[in-house]
Design a protein with these regions (language model features):
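Active-site- or binding-pocket-proximal scaffold segments within functional domains
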Residues: 1-313
């Protein structure tokens, strides 16, 4: 009887892939995964293919490709002979619009299940898009699809295109056992509102210092993004993800590192909006460490949280 194995999916952010020198936390985490009894699948970000470059960046065109690519991977692997579905643990990661794609993938799996046959992949997708509960239930009862659970969902600063329809975006899919979400405290681009989860005991959602790619990775200086990567590694390791010790040791998280300005160039003309930190939100301990080490760093949207510390007020 074979041991359990992990199926690991990574959906990268807009205009991100593994060809660039500066990689996001998605491929970094996948590359840190041990290879024994683990299979990794990577979906490059929307806008990386030539014909979807501009619409992918602006409107999120290409999300269907990411979702269906990952869905086909799961269908193939979960149906391989010698492996029962219960022996296979699913881990899904995503950044930016890739995080939104990862969340939609979870919604698809929860609604339609996994098809036994490759030709039913598109059917499962259409049932999800149409929210066709009757057909999904009927096809699972008749043995064309089967249900499964997702052990861990890890996302960095989820955003979506404003033209994308809503599919319970704020609610964690019931098939997901645990989710973690790292949110960018200092991102101010109006077209990049964070798509947070509603409060749930299964969701660990925290604010981190930095703009969008300081949190999700992609800048030459990984000081801040290594903080969130290490956090995500720790959270997923606790759920059974196996990682290379050398890759973890290579991280250099630094709360006092470079914090970039994303509100430059054409983004300035699209507007500015400071993200709201709610009273019940969790702010990661590294934010306080940055406030201590960088005297000029006092995020206005976290003023209520800062007031809890007399030495930072």
């Amino acid at each position: 009887m074979p041991r359990a194995r992990n199926l690991i999916i990574g959906c990268d952010g807009t205009w991100n892939d593994t060809a660039g020198i500066e990689r996001t936390n998605v491929p970094k985490l996948l590359n840190a995964c041990a290879t024994r009894h683990q299979i990794v699948h990577y979906e490059e970000g929307v806008g990386t293919a030539y014909l979807e470059a501009l619409p992918g960046g602006i409107y999120g065109k290409g999300l269907d490709r990411q979702i269906l690519g990952a869905y086909r991977f799961l269908r193939k692997r979960l149906n391989e002979s010698g492996w029962a579905s219960a022996q296979q643990n699913i881990f899904i990661f995503g950044f930016s619009r890739g995080a939104y794609a990862a969340r939609r993938l979870c919604g698809l799996i929860n609604h339609s299940g996994i098809p036994y046959r490759a030709r039913d992949v598109e059917l499962g997708w259409q049932m999800y898009l149409n929210q066709d509960v009757y057909s999904a239930s009927h096809l699972q009862t008749n043995g064309r699809f089967f249900s499964t659970t997702i052990k861990f969902l890890g996302v960095w600063d989820s955003v979506k295109s404003t033209i994308d329809p809503d599919y319970a975006d704020l609610t964690l899919s019931p098939c997901v056992r645990k989710a973690c979400h790292a949110m960018a405290l200092d991102e101010q681009r109006k077209p990049f509102p964070v798509l947070r989860f509603n409060a749930s005991q299964r969701v660990n959602q925290q604010w981190f210092s930095g703009v969008h790619s300081d949190v999700g990775g992609g800048y030459p200086e990984p000081d801040l993004s290594d903080i969130t990567l290490k956090w995500m590694i720790d959270q997923s390791w606790a759920e059974g993800l196996r990682l290379k010790a050398s890759a973890v040791r290579a991280l250099k998280p630094n709360p006092a590192g470079v914090l970039h300005n994303s509100l430059t160039g054409p983004w300035q003309s699209l507007g500015r909006k400071i993200r709201r930190v709610r009273k019940e939100d969790v702010v990661h301990e590294s934010v306080r460490a940055r406030c201590v080490e960088v005297a000029s760093y006092r995020p206005r949207n976290a003023s209520q949280w800062l007031n809890e510390f007399s030495d930072l007020a």
